[in-house]
């Protein structure tokens, strides 16, 4: 993908979405590079580990979601976290699997995939690329396709870790999580239960944590949890 002219972008005062003209192919290439970097810098559990076996039991039959090929993995880290990327990669941290039931884990997976399907992750990737370029003073004008450097990928990982979605985006991802559970014969209340659990864990959690990012707008938190329950109720009627 092409490097953007950072000087002009800053001078124009444009936000990330406006400053960067990235095609779907660019995003796909960045996503692939990003996931290669993440998998290199985080310990992936082995398929025959307890986490690996559990993940296979939950997701082994899921090869594609809404036309997107998916692959799953577990990072053997204590963080209560999960994310999905534009290349179809879904990663769950062992810390999240430790505190959640199977249906709650599946709901979170569905929620994160929902952000990709709804292109929320694409926008977050654009913003992260802009922020990483600023941090690394990258962005010299170039018409040549270039790979991200290791430092740029590290900065992008840092930027994505702090990314927050709008309440509307979170509502839609929650709804997708409920539907994902239903399609895979999982309790539709998994989303409601996982949100409740994350809400409990968010008390006192660092502002940069997954729990705090999931509930970035505190006044609407109760509504969001209630809405997830209402969505599940419809499938139980």
Regions found by a protein language model. Name each.
Residues 1-237:
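A Zn2+-metalloprotease active-site environment signal
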């Amino acid at each position: 993908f092409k490097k953007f002219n950072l000087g002009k972008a800053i001078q124009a005062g444009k936000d990330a979405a406006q400053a960067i003209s990235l095609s779907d192919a660019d995003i796909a290439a960045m996503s692939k590079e990003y996931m290669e970097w993440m998998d290199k810098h985080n310990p992936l559990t082995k398929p025959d580990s307890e986490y690996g076996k559990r993940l296979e039991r939950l997701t082994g039959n899921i090869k594609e979601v809404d036309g997107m090929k998916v692959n799953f993995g577990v990072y053997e880290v204590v963080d209560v976290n999960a994310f999905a990327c534009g290349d179809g990669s879904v990663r769950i941290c062992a810390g999240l699997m430790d505190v959640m039931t199977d249906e709650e884990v599946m709901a979170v997976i569905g929620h994160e995939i929902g952000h990709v399907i709804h292109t929320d992750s694409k926008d977050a990737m654009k913003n992260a690329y802009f922020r990483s370029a600023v941090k690394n003073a990258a962005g010299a004008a170039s018409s040549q396709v270039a790979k991200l450097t290791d430092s740029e990928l590290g900065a992008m990982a840092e930027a994505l870790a702090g990314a927050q979605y709008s309440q509307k985006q979170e509502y839609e991802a929650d709804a997708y999580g409920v539907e994902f559970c239903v399609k895979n014969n999982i309790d539709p209340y998994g989303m409601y239960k996982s949100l409740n659990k994350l809400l409990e864990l968010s008390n006192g959690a660092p502002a940069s944590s997954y729990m705090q990012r999931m509930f970035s707008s505190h006044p609407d938190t109760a509504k969001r949890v209630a809405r997830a329950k209402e969505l599940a109720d419809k499938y139980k009627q």
